[in-house]
Amino acid sequence: MAVKILTDSTSCMNNDLINKFHINLVSLSVSFDDESFKEKDISNEVFYEKMNEKGIPKSSQPSIEDLCSVMEEVVSVGDELLCIFISSDMSGTYSTAHIARDMVIEKYKDAKIEILDSRSNCMQLGFAAISAARAAMDGKSLEEVKLAAEENMKKSRFLFIPDNLVYLKKGGRIGGAGALIGNLLKIIPILTVEDGKTSVFAKIRTKKRAVETMVQRVLEDTDKFGMGGIAVHHINCYDEAKRLAETIKNKFKVDPIICDIGPVIGLHVGPGAIGIAYYTEKNMR
């Protein structure tokens, strides 16, 4: 009997990480008027071409069928499962997973399935899933594996910078007037995820300065709490992400992971966005 991990596609983990840590993944979807895609099945390049042509799509949580399928695959062979998902304030995935679990437990009475709200997304979620997977690979119990994820959540932060405010405005994530004023004044916000919701971390005049401010915050946190792990996120700006990763490598003496941000998160932020997700050795909160 082993403990397995299930997370969702908004963790933005690349295939190397998924395979290395034996993590199960269920995908959220994006839907235009005439077609739908699981976000793992469409590249950012194709997605934004379609978005420019067809307008803002809707995002949707994984189906109950998809969730039940993965859960059954795990528990049917006697393994236990920890599910850790995107913040419940951002998606109904966490809520739907409880319905799926109840359905699976009706069929497999002895099944053990725990569900955790990460209160985050992207690699802030991914790092919690990886921490759980490491504990599982060490032979820890389901309760200990869940605790490992919860402990990582106390140590992590995600900062990201949109290239402009157009997509945030289109997606309705900030007020239209705020987006217009921001663009007129050429203000670039640094955004973060705090207690499950997106909030403004800082407002900076240029993207270059915003990136410097973001790196400086990582430096302050890791000087105080130690460096655990770090990832650079980007949307269709790999060269910029690679330069940021090189800066981080030189400054922190660690090799950051580089991960795309997929369509479900990306439709609210837009191409050109760049960010850093990281966790520390000691608790930040």
Curated annotation (Swiss-Prot):
PROSITE patterns: DEGV. The keyword Transcription does not apply. Residues 3-280 form the DegV domain. InterPro entries: DegV (IPR003797), DegV_C (IPR043168), DegV_domain_contain (IPR050270). Keywords: Lipid-binding. Hexadecanoate binds at S59, S91. GO terms for molecular function: lipid binding. The keyword Isomerase does not apply. It comes from the Bacteria. May bind long-chain fatty acids, such as palmitate, and may play a role in lipid transport or fatty acid metabolism. This is DegV domain-containing protein CA_C3284. It comes from Clostridium acetobutylicum (strain ATCC 824 / DSM 792 / JCM 1419 / IAM 19013 / LMG 5710 / NBRC 13948 / NRRL B-527 / VKM B-1787 / 2291 / W).
